[in-house]
Amino acid sequence: MASSTDVRPKITLACEVCKHRNYITKKNRRNDPDRLELKKFCPNCGTHQSHRESK
């Protein structure tokens, strides 16, 4: 089972505009200790928006 100290945990990316959680991905905690922020397409907004890691 996955532990809380997993090196590559699953994270969800939420749109900064509409706050919908649209994407699930993995990240490497050693390379990206801060919250991940990517520009992805938001199907709810219909445009490319900034998506940020949410809990």
Swiss-Prot record:
What are the recorded Gene Ontology BP terms? translation
Lipid metabolism recorded as keyword: no
Stored PROSITE patterns: RIBOSOMAL_L33
Q: Which Pfam families match?
A: Ribosomal_L33
Keywords annotated in UniProt: Ribonucleoprotein, Ribosomal protein
A single Gene Ontology CC term: cytoplasm
GO MF entries: structural constituent of ribosome
Report the sequence similarity comment from the record.
Belongs to the bacterial ribosomal protein bL33 family.
Matching PANTHER family, A to Z?
50S RIBOSOMAL PROTEIN L33, CHLOROPLASTIC, LARGE RIBOSOMAL SUBUNIT PROTEIN BL33C
Please state what the protein is called: Large ribosomal subunit protein bL33A
Could you tell me which species this protein originates from? Answer: Rhodococcus jostii (strain RHA1)
Q: Identify the gene encoding this protein.
A: rpmG1
